[in-house]
Amino acid sequence: MDVTIQHPWFRRALGPFYPSRLFDQFFGEGLFEYDLLPFLSSTISPYYRQSLFRTVLDSGISEVRSDRDKFVIFLDVKHFSPEDLTVKVLDDFVEIHGKHNERQDDHGYISREFHRRYRLPTAVDQSALSCSLSADGMLTFSGPKIVDPSHSERTIPVSREEKPSSAPSS
């Protein structure tokens, strides 16, 4: 039985499942060895893999939900205070802007700024929109949808006919 042995260089952890954190919104929190040299960890230990779940959590989660009754946006803004955030509705868009000036942290000085824009569904009641910031830094923007009575759900009964269908058979 032949076993293929690969040089560690060919087992590098490069690609979309092992992105660098250098350019995400949390770049000021400090760096790990694999942020600077993502292939180094797999060269030293080919069985080491960065958790994909950890990568998703570190990316600044933004989630949009639009169901029948309401429209909701969840946005992770844990590095911003309510005074640093501006939420505006312009026509059919909601714009969320966050900016804080340079301040000192454990690694030096840092300033952050982001701008997100989401399209509002036409059925959202813009007079009843609300926005809140949780203690853990999750911004929730929501609005109820206007239910159109002409588009309400109703059940259509199925009747059984005694004669065969006149549709052509294939």
Curated annotation (Swiss-Prot):
Modification note: Acetylation at Lys-70 may increase chaperone activity.
One Pfam family here: HSP20
Segments crossing the lipid bilayer: none
InterPro entries associated with the record: A-crystallin/Hsp20_dom, Alpha-crystallin/HSP_16, Alpha-crystallin/sHSP_animal, Alpha-crystallin_N, HSP20-like_chaperone
Amino-acid positions noted as binding Zn(2+) 2 in the UniProt annotation, renumbered to this chain: 107
Subcellular location(s) per record: Cytoplasm; Nucleus
Chain sites annotated for binding Zn(2+) 1: 100, 102
UniProt keyword Metal-binding, yes or no: yes
Record protein name field: Alpha-crystallin A chain
Species in which this protein is naturally found: Choloepus hoffmanni
Gene, per the UniProt record: CRYAA
